[in-house]
Amino acid sequence: LVALSPYLRGGLSFVAHATPTGASLTVQEAANSNSSGQVNTPASLPWPYLRTNIYGINADKSAYMADGILINYSDNFSNGIDDMDALKSYNTSENLSVKSNNILLAVERRHTIINTDTIFLNLTGVKIQSYRFEVIATSLYHPGLTGFLEDAYLNTSTPLNIAGTTFITFTVVKVPASHSATRFRTGFMGQ
């Protein structure tokens, strides 16, 4: 994520999505900027988050980042779909999204984690090859809380480091359940 600027510099773009109540967007010529310098400044996220990236593994063992999602947690957020969530925009190959209330999201802002939370991942466009999830948890740790990634195809559950990064490698093969969009989900449990 980047710090927001009131200006849209040449060569940049953005996506706008109207909420059900409707909205309008007007870009005035005065919003153009001829200034130079750094366009985007990385910003730290003010809320606990779970970021999940997926990397494709090439035959030569090199990797490419294919897609990713972000989930922010706060008592101020709702688990319902609202204008704080970002819809998934599809690309031409692998697509990773969160499926929440039958809506596919790239960014979801959810209420603070409870012991029974489940994040349903939606993974499409995969190829017959190996992949690696990078699951980055920041400020999620609470005594007794554990996280895991479930693989419905292999019927496995891999523990997540809820105070750091976890890497999980998996392979897609020529079996329908192996490339099912609903193969993976992230869950939490507490004591």
What role is predicted for each listed range?
Residues 1-191:
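Compositionally biased Ser/Thr/Gly- and acidic/asparagine-rich
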